[in-house]
Amino acid sequence: MTEFIRPRIIVAGTNSGVGKTTIVTGLLSYFNREGYRVQPFKVGPDYIDPGFHAEAAGHSSYNLDTWMTPPDKLNETFIALSKNADISIIEGVMGLYDGGEDGISSTAAIAKQLNAPVILVLDCKSVGYSIAATALGFREYDKGVNIVGVILNRLGSDRHEAMVREVMGKIHMPVFG
């Protein structure tokens, strides 16, 4: 765990393809346009998504990868690279708990190490009330991961959105979008 206070958020997903990169790029662009110094990061060794991040933020995005950076150096690296930022936005890799054996290098492991709150992106296409079980499962799977809310992606209609928001309320899961 970290002892520092530095504004940061992780945008994670239930799996690849749920819209993490699109959402993170939108957030980076928004904060940059509003005059905030936003520092992007990507969990893992990906070099494509950081290119999108850099375009939106106006400067480099960095990888947070405990395969390449020893875990005991990760906090030090994060602090150094985010020192001039008003907020850091970290895009997760694959699904929140996916990584190497025992979750090494997973987004969840990075979130716990950096003591970073997590916003979980849910793909709501072709699902209604059952999406609450998915969100609840992710929240309960590891209580050390601080899932602070969700972003609902690929909603089919206003009615669909209302249904999903209602069921998220039943499990006390904040919806950010």
Regions found by a protein language model. Name each.
Residues 2-18, 22, 28-114, 122-149, ...:
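ATP-dependent carboxylate-amine ligase catalytic core
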Residues 149-177:
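GTPase G-domain guanine-specificity segment
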